[in-house]
């Protein structure tokens, strides 16, 4: 299957043959497992002090006194039990708990291939919430000159030319302050995902693109299901460079 390659000014440069990975069967079940596996790999096992809440001289006076048989201090305050101040936790976290969801290597590669193929299907991309009206084609491939862009305003001009600015506006307008304790824990804002830019190798365009709302940039060799299907939902609007297409062809 061939698709158009676009210059930075929006004109057509020519055609490029897509790798066979873009014709992979859509498997949302595998994609979900692969993304969850990547997310859980970041979790750190945690536990508590084995004697937390146990370091007390409180004793139970036993039954027959008309009061709960809770261990009490000399002053009569409850201790040791979960419902008492300074008592142990009822069900503390265990370091033995298995947090990482394992996935076979071939399944993980199949999930990535399926997610890449889904990014080229307009119905799936649109169902994910992306604004693709006016986008020339899916998958969207641009000239390798894109990788030499060093300024964010230059990248933004290319996005406007390729009609990707509507999706950037959607992501920017969707930034909201979260409710609850998350605001105090370094994750104050809910930030929608916008365009994913896939480049061939490390280049200046990485720093120039990533400051745009919702935009992520990744090299073709580092691309995984968590990038192209964030939140386990496939169909992310993706911009490929010519070099990235060649690199992807080498991975599959």
Swiss-Prot record:
Question: What organism is recorded for this protein?
Answer: Methanococcus maripaludis (strain C7 / ATCC BAA-1331)
Oligomer status and interactors: Part of the 50S ribosomal subunit.
- Would you tell me the Gene Ontology cellular component terms? ribonucleoprotein complex; ribosome
The cross-references to InterPro entries, in alphabetical order and at most eight, read: Ribosomal_uL4, Ribosomal_uL4_dom_sf, Ribosomal_uL4_euk/arc_CS, Ribosomal_uL4_euk/arch, Ribosomall_uL4-arc
- Tell me, which GO biological process terms does this entry list? translation
Q: Which UniProt keywords apply?
A: Ribonucleoprotein, Ribosomal protein, RNA-binding, rRNA-binding
User: Domain of life, per the record?
Assistant: Archaea
Q: Name one Pfam family in it.
A: Ribosomal_L4
Q: Which gene encodes it?
A: rpl4
Molecular function terms from GO: rRNA binding; structural constituent of ribosome
Give the protein family.
Belongs to the universal ribosomal protein uL4 family.
Name of the protein in its database record: Large ribosomal subunit protein uL4
* Stated role: One of the primary rRNA binding proteins, this protein initially binds near the 5'-end of the 23S rRNA. It is important during the early stages of 50S assembly. It makes multiple contacts with different domains of the 23S rRNA in the assembled 50S subunit and ribosome.
HAMAP family in alphabetical order: Ribosomal_uL4_A (MF_01328_A)
């Amino acid at each position: 299957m061939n698709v158009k390659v676009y210059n930075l000014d929006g004109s057509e440069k020519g055609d490029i043959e897509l790798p066979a990975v873009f014709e992979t069967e859509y498997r949302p079940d595998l994609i979900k497992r692969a993304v969850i596996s990547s997310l859980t790999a970041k979790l750190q096992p945690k536990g508590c002090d084995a004697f937390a809440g146990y370091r007390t001289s409180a004793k139970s006076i036993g039954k027959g006194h008309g009061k709960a048989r809770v261990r009490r201090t000399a002053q009569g305050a409850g201790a040791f039990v979960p419902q008492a101040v300074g008592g142990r936790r009822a069900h503390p976290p265990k370091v033995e708990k298995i947090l990482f969801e394992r996935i076979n290597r071939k399944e993980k590669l199949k999930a990535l291939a399926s997610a890449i193929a889904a990014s080229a299907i307009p119905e799936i991309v649109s169902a994910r919430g992306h604004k693709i009206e006016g986008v020339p084609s899916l998958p969207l491939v641009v000239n390798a000159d894109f990788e030499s862009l060093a300024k964010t305003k230059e990248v933004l001009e290319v996005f406007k030319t390729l009609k990707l600015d509507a999706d950037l506006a959607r992501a920017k307008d969707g930034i909201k302050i979260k409710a609850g304790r998350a605001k105090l824990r370094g994750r104050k804002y809910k930030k929608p995902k916008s365009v994913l830019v896939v480049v061939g190798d490390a280049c200046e365009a990485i720093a120039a693109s990533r400051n745009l709302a919702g935009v992520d940039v990744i090299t073709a060799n580092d691309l995984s299901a968590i990038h192209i299907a964030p939140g386990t939902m496939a169909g992310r609007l993706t911009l490929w460079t010519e070099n990235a297409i060649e690199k992807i062809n080498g991975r599959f």
